């Protein structure tokens, strides 16, 4: 089990910087998540890692990891150093992966992404949509209102796929959405884009850990009930269903 997301003692280390240029060319969710993870390691000044480590932290399949590592290398965004033990394979999970100088963090040309974003078990699609909203976010109001189509065009996703990930992020309390209306020249009102408010990562981490603690308590309670039921014939325990004493026959 992964450790629960924790915040560093220094608030300045809550986030790492991702260059705006990452969205200036075509990129999909898996490619964004891989690059973002490498930027997080770079900011922490961690040593180079291999594909296996990235794969475990992003939750993608091995084939997906290898596929997009090859694509990112061909675009000059990452460098792969081959493991001598696996030279026959085109790409090995033991190959070392590092960022190149093609994408650089420049003053005033980056957006922040929370260091703890990889500890919540988010899918690469959720990470990518969350990252794009942070890219578009107003730094004073913490709001933005890109359309589903705009988000999808930036991440090579369909409108329905974007909607799915937005709803998941809202359910997990990373964002809050609010419908808007626009007034046309003829005075009629039409539904506008959703307005997104990005919740502070401090509150997200706190709420996440509270939910995990509640879940752990429920599981412990169920485990104790199951142990008791093993020694008391006639009892059945099912998750989410309160136990009932069987009726006695006359």
At which residue positions do the language-model features occur?
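Electropositive, intrinsically flexible nucleic-acid-contacting patches
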Residues: 1-250
């Amino acid at each position: 089990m992964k450790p629960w997301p924790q915040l560093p003692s220094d608030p300045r280390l809550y986030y790492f910087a991702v260059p705006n240029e990452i969205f200036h060319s075509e990129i999909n969710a898996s490619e964004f998540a891989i690059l973002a993870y490498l930027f997080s390691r770079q900011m922490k000044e961690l040593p180079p890692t291999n594909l296996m480590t990235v794969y475990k932290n992003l939750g993608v399949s091995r084939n997906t990891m290898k596929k997009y590592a090859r694509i990112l290398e061909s675009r000059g965004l990452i460098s792969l150093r081959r493991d001598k033990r696996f030279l026959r394979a085109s790409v090995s999970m033991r190959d070392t992966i590092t960022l190149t100088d093609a994408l650089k963090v420049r003053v005033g040309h980056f957006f922040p992404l929370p260091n703890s974003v990889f500890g919540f078990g988010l899918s690469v699609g959720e990470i990518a949509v969350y990252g794009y909203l942070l890219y578009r976010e107003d730094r004073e109001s913490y709001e933005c209102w890109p359309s589903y189509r705009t988000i999808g065009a930036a991440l090579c996703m369909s409108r329905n796929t974007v909607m799915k990930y937005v709803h998941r992020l809202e359910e997990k309390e990373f964002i809050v959405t609010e419908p808007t209306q626009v007034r046309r020249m003829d005075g009629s009102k039409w539904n506008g884009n959703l307005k997104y408010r990005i919740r502070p990562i401090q509150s997200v981490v706190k709420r996440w850990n509270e939910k995990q603690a509640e879940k752990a308590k429920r599981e412990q309670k169920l485990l104790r009930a199951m142990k008791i039921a093993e020694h008391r014939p006639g009892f059945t325990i099912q998750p989410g269903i309160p136990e009932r004493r069987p009726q006695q026959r006359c």
